Amino acid sequence: MGYFQGNDFRKITGGKKGKHRDKRKFELGSPPTETKLSTEELIEKERGMGGNIKIRVKYATFANIYDPQEKVSKKAKILSVIETPANKEYARRGIIVKGSIIQTELGKAKVTSRPGQDGTINAILIKE
């Protein structure tokens, strides 16, 4: 079933409004991409508005970690999701979103990209 993002054809009282047109394709949405920590990577391409391509990370193993001390970026394996300020349940389920604190081979890092929108996981190393 599709995700409709237009007006819901109902009045405040609960009664039905008269439809003046059918639903359009541009009003179609999709469920949130909950990027999960996994042993294998899966990246999906999806058509967006205007024929643009949206790249979504479904399962992730590695992240691009920026070290502000050395001013260099490195690819590192993600070991675990420590904390997620957006939703405490996400950390328990291993879901990575922007702002999540992840444990990598290089140390703790804070995710700066949106994996469900950008198609990659970028993070900045946190000094302890």
Swiss-Prot record:
Keyword Nuclease among UniProt keywords: no
Region of interest: Disordered: 1-37
UniProt xrefs under InterPro entries: Ribosomal_eS8 (IPR001047), Ribosomal_eS8_CS (IPR018283), Ribosomal_protein_eS8_arc (IPR020919), Ribosomal_Se8/biogenesis_NSA2 (IPR022309)
GO molecular function, one term: structural constituent of ribosome
CDD domains named among the record's database cross-references: Ribosomal_S8e
Gene Ontology CC entries for this record: ribonucleoprotein complex; ribosome
Source superkingdom: Archaea
GO biological process: translation
Segments of skewed composition (Basic residues): 13-23
NCBIfam families assigned to the protein according to its UniProt record, in alphabetical order: eS8
Family: Belongs to the eukaryotic ribosomal protein eS8 family.
Record's protein name: Small ribosomal subunit protein eS8
